Structures are given as C-alpha cells and as structure tokens.
C-alpha cells in the first residue's frame, strides 16, 4: 500500500504526530520535498523530538528515507542524527537512507537567502535557510547533489566550477563573497560527506520494490498546501510543491500506485510569517487559540497567526490533493470557548465566494462569512474514544465532515500518541 500524507493548510497541522502514529503500520516512511525550513514535533511520553529533516517514523521499526525532491543541509542532518543517538535512538544506514540525487544546501545558499530577504521592501517570511536558492540551483542544473558531497574530488571540482558565479551573486547583494571558498567550510563539508556516505541510496528503487513486494509505504509531506510554489498564496509560499501529486513526481513512483491520500487538518487555522489569512483573529478568541495551542513555529520560533476554520481554503486543498480521508488535529484547543466559528464563504466587495480567488491580493481582501456553533467547556485531552467527546465538540466535528465531503478518519486531542483515536 502506498499512502501520501500532506498538510491541508499553511503547515503546522500536526503531520509529525500523525505520521508517528501511523508508522507502526508502514515499512518505509519517506520525505518527498522541502528542507529544514519545515519542522515536525513527535511526543512520546515525556520525550519531545523536534526535527526538520529526518522523517517522523524514526522511532518505530520503519526505514526512513529522504527523497530527491528535498534539499538537504548536511550539517543540520548530522546534528539531528547526533541528537537522536544521544537519546538512545540508533540512526544506522539500515534505518535511514538519502537519495543520491538529493540537492545539497551549501553555505552560500544560506547567505544569499538572508541577503535577499533583508533587501526586500515587502518581506515574504523566508526562514533564511537557503531553501529557495538551493531549488534555484536544481532548476538551473547548477546543484551539488548528495552523490557529489560524498566524493571529495567531485565536490571540490563542483565548488570550483561555481565559485565565480556565486561570489558575484553575493557581492551584488552586498555580502561577503569569501564564504564561497572558505577553506574551513569546505573541509567541514568534505567531512560531512564522508560521514553521510553510508546512507546514500536510490529512493525510487526502494519504494517501487517495496510496493511490488506488498509492503506499506508512507510519503510524508512538509509544510502545507497553501505554501505550494504553484498553487499556494503567491508570493508568500515555499520553493517546492507541497501537494500530494508532487510525491509521485519527486519520488519516482507512478500515480497508479497510490492507494490513499490523507490530509492533516487543524481544527482552526494558523500561519507563520506573511501572507493572507482571511479568518485571522485579533481578539480574545485568537489569543486563546495561540496560547492554549502553543502556536510557535518549530523551525523559526516565530509566533503563529491564528484564525477560525476556513472551509473555502479546505475545499481547494481537497481538490488539489485528492484526499480520501483527513485527520483533524488540536480539537482540544477549542475547549472553553463560548462560541466556535467556521468560515463557510467569503465576502469580496459584496460578492459571496464559496471558493478562494486565485489572485493572492484578492484573497487578502476577502472577509469571512461565519456559521456559529455552540462551544464547550469539557477538557478533551483525556478522551480515548470519539464517542466520549463533549456533545458540542462532536457536533463541530460532524459539521466539518459534512461540509468537507471527505471522511474524518482520525481525531487528535493532544500532542501524545495516546491522544489520537479513530473516528
């Protein structure tokens, strides 16, 4: 079975938690896009793991793979491996694989990203991790690949070839071009390549072989649907395609092999950084969602903007991803609100819209049209079965499912493994 899992909103929906829950049933868990600009949190008992590159299935028996559609900072990956091994989690080459075609984020990518953002009159909210510039080099066929990194001679030749153009680009943006040929940095990357060499594999081959043998494969997306480089809220997006279809293209798996597409949906909506968020709240309800939900970005630590559930956006996410089911997370955060609202449509200059406009500037002008539901005061964090949640919470979930037209398969009421149950 081949399952694709993506975030349906702007990221931070709780994908890592759901992947961790499902991983026990999957032989392979694979990351298919993004870089260390995305973060996922896995909570097991008192242990909290915050990772950016290693897929969420690392704590169970699954083999975890980093696919060629990702961009990889080898220093960050080495730090994650060290962190896990210090907590007693072995990260051997039997456990982790990295595709040979994976693009490497170099120090000059990070420098260029920071310089470009600092010069923008209107910030786009980049994490300044070098993600976009690494993808630019991939498209320009000017990248350093994982297969280059692990061969010191090829690596040095590639860096020598690109030095002049990278130095010129940094100089043009007012930076110090010496970072491109810094001998200490080059030595560091040579050593990183040597360390990571045992992990190199062919991810497409591994996945297709596993599927043909009747094994289960889970493709784990990063970020969220509306950060997609094509279909997201341009220009406030990431540099990769975050929707389900890109899993097949990036991993080299034919679309006829997909069995299930699972969307992760937060019971409200959040966004880190700039860009339109039609239901954004600046009142006590917004403060409640932010504080009770601990809404701070895993990667940046920035405060997340919070708003009510946005049905028009979710309708589009369902179309873009083809969800067969969804997991609803953070339902517990809505407890103790007198009223819970759902945005069912937008008002754009007097016109009712049931679906988001394509133009980002128009989306930012949309005013939400709400349905109001009764709130609840019950603490849901100890609930183990869907049948036992508060009546008003039950009504909220049923209303969302009815409006979405896609079955809610899982409901989450807290960060722990035991706080997610099937509906």
Curated annotation (Swiss-Prot):
Keyword terms: Cytoplasm, GTP-binding, Ligase, Magnesium, Metal-binding, Nucleotide-binding, Purine biosynthesis
Residues annotated to bind IMP: 12-15, 37-40, 127, 141, 223, 238, 302
Key word Ribosomal protein present: no
Pathway: Purine metabolism; AMP biosynthesis via de novo pathway; AMP from IMP: step 1/2
GO cellular component assignments: cytoplasm
Subcellular location: Cytoplasm
Entry GO MF terms: adenylosuccinate synthase activity; GTP binding; magnesium ion binding
One Gene Ontology term from the biological process aspect of the record: IMP metabolic process
Cofactor dependence: Mg(2+)
Superkingdom of this protein's organism: Archaea
Cofactor, how bound (note): Binds 1 Mg(2+) ion per subunit.
Catalysed transformations (reactions): IMP + L-aspartate + GTP = N(6)-(1,2-dicarboxyethyl)-AMP + GDP + phosphate + 2 H(+)
Keyword Cell membrane attached: no
Active site: residue positions: 12 (proton acceptor), 40 (proton donor)
Enzyme Commission designation: 6.3.4.4
Family matches, as Pfam families: Adenylsucc_synt
Binding site for substrate: 298-304
Chain sites annotated for binding Mg(2+): 12, 39
Binding-site list for GTP: 11-17, 39-41, 304, 330-332, 412-414
Assembly notes: Homodimer.
Family as reported in the entry's similarity comment: Belongs to the adenylosuccinate synthetase family.
Physiological role: Plays an important role in the de novo pathway of purine nucleotide biosynthesis. Catalyzes the first committed step in the biosynthesis of AMP from IMP.
Name this protein carries in UniProt: Adenylosuccinate synthetase
């Amino acid at each position: 079975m081949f399952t694709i899992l993506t975030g349906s909103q702007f990221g931070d929906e709780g994908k890592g938690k759901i992947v961790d829950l499902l991983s026990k049933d999957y032989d392979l868990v694979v990351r298919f896009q993004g870089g260390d600009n995305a973060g996922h949190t896995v909570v097991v008992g008192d242990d909290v793991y915050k990772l950016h590159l290693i897929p969420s299935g690392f704590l169970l028996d699954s083999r975890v793979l980093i696919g060629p559609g990702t961009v990889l900072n080898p220093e960050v990956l080495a730090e994650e491996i060290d962190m896990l091994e210090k907590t007693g989690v072995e990260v051997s080459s039997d456990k982790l694989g990295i595709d040979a075609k994976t693009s490497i984020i170099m120090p000059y990518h990070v420098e260029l990203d920071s310089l470009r953002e600092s010069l923008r009159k209107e910030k786009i909210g980049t994490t300044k991790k070098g993600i976009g510039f690494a993808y630019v080099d991939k498209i320009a066929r000017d990248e350093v690949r994982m297969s280059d990194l692990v061969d010191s001679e090829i690596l040095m030749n590639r860096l020598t070839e690109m030095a002049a153009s990278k130095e010129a680009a940094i100089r043009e943006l007012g930076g110090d071009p010496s970072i491109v040929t810094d001998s200490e940095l080059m030595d560091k990357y040579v050593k990183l390549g040597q360390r990571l060499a045992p992990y190199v594999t062919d991810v497409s081959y591994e996945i297709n072989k596993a599927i043909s043998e009747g094994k289960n494969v889970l493709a784990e997306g990063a970020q969220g649907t509306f950060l997609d480089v094509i279909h997201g809220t341009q220009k406030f997006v990431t540099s990769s395609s975050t929707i389900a279809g890109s899993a097949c293209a990036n991993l080299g798996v034919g679309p006829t092999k997909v069995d299930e597409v699972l969307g992760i949906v937060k019971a409200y909506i959040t966004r880190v950084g700039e860009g339109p968020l039609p239901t954004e709240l600046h009142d006590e309800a917004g403060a409640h969602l932010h504080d009770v939900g601990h809404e701070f970005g895993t990667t940046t630590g920035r405060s997340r903007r919070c708003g009510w559930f946005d049905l028009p956006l979710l309708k589009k996410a369902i179309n873009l991803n083809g969800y067969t089911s969804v997991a609803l997370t953070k339902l517990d955060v809505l407890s103790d609100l007198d009223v819970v609202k759902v945005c069912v449509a937008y008002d754009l200059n007097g016109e009712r819209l049931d679906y988001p406009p394509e133009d980002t500037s128009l989306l930012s002008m949309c005013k939400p049209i709400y349905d109001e539901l009764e709130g609840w005061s019950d603490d849901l964090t100890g609930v183990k079965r869907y049948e036992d949640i508060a009546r008003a919470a039950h009504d909220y979930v049923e209303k969302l499912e009815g409006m979405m037209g896609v079955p809610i398969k899982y409901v989450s009421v807290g960060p722990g493994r035991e706080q997610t149950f099937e509906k």
